[in-house]
Amino acid sequence: MQTNSSLLNLDVIQIQHYQQNRYPMLFIDFVKEALPGKYAKGYKNFSFNEWFFPAHFADEPNVPGFVQVEMLTQMFLMTFLTLPGNKEKKTSFVSISNAQFKRKIVPGERVDIESTLSFYSRGVAKGKSVGTING
């Protein structure tokens, strides 16, 4: 849903119009605000029934690192896939720098994600994503 001429607000169905990730690999629930070519803000809610919790780990469920990286990456994708002509383009990443995991994410928590795009040219993007737990 477009809120003005350039600022976007997207639910999970609308997100799928921009990127190719689908269940069980879609790890963002809502894009609260996206300014194409600049930034995207949104969140992911983790409920106890996520497919990975029974295996990671039964006695102390927490979100696997690869899911956390993918979640941050998917919000970053929204900074440039929302640009005209980029809808549903296939993407891949070459490197991740300075990744830090401060603590476990457990069932019932929400991760708020802010991504900024610092460079985009000829299909190559560079930027930053930060996730904070429960605001």
Question: Where on the chain are the PLM-derived regions?
Answer:
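Hydrophobic beta-strand-centered segment that forms part of the acyl-chain substrate-binding groove
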Residues: 2-9, 75-114
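Non-catalytic linker/capping segments at the edges of enzyme domains
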Residues: 1-62, 89-90, 105-106, 121-122, ...
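Hydrophobic beta-sheet segments that form the core/acyl-binding groove
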Residues: 31, 96-134
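Active-site helix/loop of acyl-thioester processing domains in fatty-acid/polyketide metabolism
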Residues: 31, 62-87
